[in-house]
């Protein structure tokens, strides 16, 4: 009787463990530069300026079977802005705009993840809500995110990748130089690849 009880407990424990898939922890691949944040903003309503932030890092936890439990944190160095024009980059990082000398980092921390199904390519999608801190001000934003895939890499690691889009009003994040209402909206695109922590 004791042997049967122990066997039943062992089987039950194995089944329970199999059902409790733990989200894996990942570090965003900064070293390999497999992460970036791009932006697009109207210039006075006459054209568009596009650019990117070249220095960012972060971490996330994710399990494709339970995407609603995912968590992410991304940190961006504001001084790393690049718009292919040195004088403009200098102006963007000045006190007129990002004030990178005072506010060196912009930060996004997720607060919830709401799965929204799959896109036309069959990729998982979700609304990732979180707090964005920029220019010393924290505001809630929602990122439309897509899980691009996961798997082993050639170097013995395991990777997972995502992309996402959102839009913000830059005037919501403290007083910046006024360029008119057409230049307040900023479209953001983020793509990153994480390496599973060992």
Swiss-Prot record:
Keywords: Periplasm, Signal. It is found in: Periplasm. SMART domains: YceI (SM00867). GO terms for cellular component: periplasmic space. Residues 1-23 form the signal peptide. Its main location: periplasm. It holds the Pfam family YceI. Belongs to the UPF0312 family. Type 1 subfamily. This is UPF0312 protein PFL_5802. It comes from Pseudomonas fluorescens (strain ATCC BAA-477 / NRRL B-23932 / Pf-5).
């Amino acid at each position: 009787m004791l042997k049967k009880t122990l066997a039943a407990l062992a089987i039950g424990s194995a089944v329970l463990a199999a059902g409790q898939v733990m989200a894996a922890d990942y570090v965003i691949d900064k070293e390999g530069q497999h992460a970036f944040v791009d932006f697009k903003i109207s210039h006075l309503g006459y054209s568009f300026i596009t650019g990117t932030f070249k220095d960012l890092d972060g971490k996330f936890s994710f399990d494709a079977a339970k995407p609603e439990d995912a968590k992410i944190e991304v940190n961006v160095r504001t001084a790393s802005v690049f718009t292919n024009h040195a004088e403009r980059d200098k102006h963007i990082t000045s006190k007129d705009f990002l004030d990178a000398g005072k506010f060196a980092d912009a930060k996004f921390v997720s607060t919830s993840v709401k799965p929204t199904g799959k896109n036309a390519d069959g990729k998982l999608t979700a609304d990732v809500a979180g707090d964005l801190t920029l220019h010393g001000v924290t505001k809630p934003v929602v990122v439309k995110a897509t899980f691009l895939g996961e798997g082993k890499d050639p170097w013995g690691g395991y990777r997972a990748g995502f992309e996402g889009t959102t839009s913000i009003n830059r005037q919501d994040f403290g007083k910046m130089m006024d360029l008119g209402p057409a230049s307040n909206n900023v479209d953001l695109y983020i793509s990153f690849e994480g390496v599973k922590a060992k």
